[in-house]
């Protein structure tokens, strides 16, 4: 079993500095996300940006990440400067959001936000690389560190919601600027990686190209990408569906929060999971959870069943994400940890973008039955997880 699943809890050890500082940055980063996701579009509308252009602006991060992530993560690997790159990207993020806040006109905002996205999108794969490397060297658990990101996401979501009730919509951007500044402070506060934490730098682009031809890595990335992409209808249309079913905004927010709470519980007890749950098996369990979740959602379940379905988020999202994350961390060649996490992030982003684009048409044509299509996507993702598991067992048997 990979080391990150089984070690002692980092916050129960005397060696808390690295874990606490990493958790603080996760919290700041996810609090920022909890504000940006629901309220950046509200600000754009208040600025007078047309709906069609808002959609284009919001599409900037998944488009920009295809270029930004491999360039920046590879440079961080080459210079062995993951922490320094995190600080630089966080500083550019603050400057970028301040620029977005100060410009006028939809097209100018689009350009400013695209430039900001160039700094934002590599932060998560860089942070995962930094955290897994440092915690692994210290024999500490990943879950109790990462869960603070999910907690902070809920805090940011509800906190910004309360602020939006008392602030003018045109001022919401300054909440985003302030949250990004807090993230920068937490990035600067990250503990430096010691010599024992680092890995040799990659000597040339050739090994990176080999990673893209690595069948095991690609199978895992596609498995996780498809299962994560199967959430597209849920992310885009669940609130609309539940509103039609008579739920008010508070109830809808509570259901969304319940899914994140399930994820938090998974992270909290991650080191107590059975050792038999390899990364490949996590992909299978996560995919199976997604299949069950979307099949039931396709048949217009009663409101009383929705909380139970939301708890499946721990499987459909949480286990899938962890399986891909841990596999990539273990499988990355020396000097390519950030690059490998970057490639994984690109696959997840591209598959999610494609599914999101298709989800609008599916929901418009079939309504709730669009979830059945998402179940099919998850079945394929689960199948790729089974292929990865079978290959891992074969390799293990050969090694024995």
Regions found by a protein language model. Give the residues of each.
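Symmetry-related core transmembrane helices of the 12-TM Major Facilitator Superfamily/SLC fold
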Residues: 172-189, 370-388
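Juxtamembrane intracellular "pre-TM" segments in multi-pass secondary transporters
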Residues: 5-16, 190-226
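Helix-loop boundary and gating motifs at the non-cytosolic
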Residues: 13-62, 217-255
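Structural signature of the two symmetry-related core transmembrane helices
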Residues: 84-98, 281-296
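A late C-terminal transmembrane helix in Major Facilitator Superfamily
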Residues: 338-366
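Hydrophobic core of transmembrane alpha-helices in multi-pass small-molecule transporters
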Residues: 27, 96-97, 106-124, 225, ...
């Amino acid at each position: 079993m990979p080391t990150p699943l089984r070690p002692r809890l980092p916050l129960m050890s005397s060696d808390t500095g690295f874990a606490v500082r990493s958790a603080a940055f996760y919290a700041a980063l996810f609090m920022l996300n909890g504000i940006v996701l629901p309220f950046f579009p509200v600000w754009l509308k208040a600025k007078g940006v047309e709906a069609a252009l808002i959609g284009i602006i919001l599409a900037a991060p998944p488009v920009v990440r295809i270029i930004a992530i491999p360039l920046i993560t590879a440079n961080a690997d080459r210079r062995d400067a993951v922490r320094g790159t995190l600080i630089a990207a966080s500083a550019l993020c603050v400057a970028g959001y301040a620029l977005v806040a100060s410009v006028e006109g939809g097209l100018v905002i689009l350009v400013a936000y695209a430039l900001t996205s160039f700094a934002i999108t590599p932060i998560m794969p860089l942070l995962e690389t930094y955290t897994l490397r440092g915690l692994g060297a210290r024999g500490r658990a990943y879950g109790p560190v990462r869960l603070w990101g999910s907690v902070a996401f809920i805090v940011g979501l509800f906190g910004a919601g309360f602020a939006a009730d008392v602030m003018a919509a045109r001022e919401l951007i300054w909440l985003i600027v302030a949250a990004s500044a807090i993230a920068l402070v937490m990035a600067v506060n990250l503990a430096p990686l010691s010599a024992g934490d680092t890995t040799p730098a990659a000597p040339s682009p050739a090994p990176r190209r080999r990673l893209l031809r690595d069948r095991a890595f690609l199978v895992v990335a596609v498995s996780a990408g498809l299962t994560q992409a199967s959430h597209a209808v849920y992310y885009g249309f669940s609130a609309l569906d539940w509103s039609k079913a008579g739920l008010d905004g508070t109830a809808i927010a509570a259901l969304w929060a319940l899914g994140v709470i399930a994820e938090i519980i998974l992270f909290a007890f991650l080191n107590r999971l059975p050792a038999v749950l390899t990364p490949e098996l996590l992909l299978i369990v996560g995919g199976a959870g997604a299949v069950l979740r979307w099949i039931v959602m396709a048949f217009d379940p009663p409101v009383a069943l929705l909380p139970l379905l939301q708890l499946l988020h721990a499987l459909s999202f949480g286990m899938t994400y962890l399986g891909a994350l841990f596999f990539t961390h273990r499988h990355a060649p020396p000097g390519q940890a950030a690059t490998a996490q970057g490639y994984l992030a690109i696959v997840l982003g591209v598959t999610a973008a494609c599914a999101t684009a298709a989800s609008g048409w599916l929901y418009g044509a079939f309504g709730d039955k669009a979830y059945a299509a998402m179940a099919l996507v998850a079945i394929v993702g689960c199948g790729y997880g089974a292929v990865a598991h079978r290959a891992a067992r074969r390799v293990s048997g050969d090694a024995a």
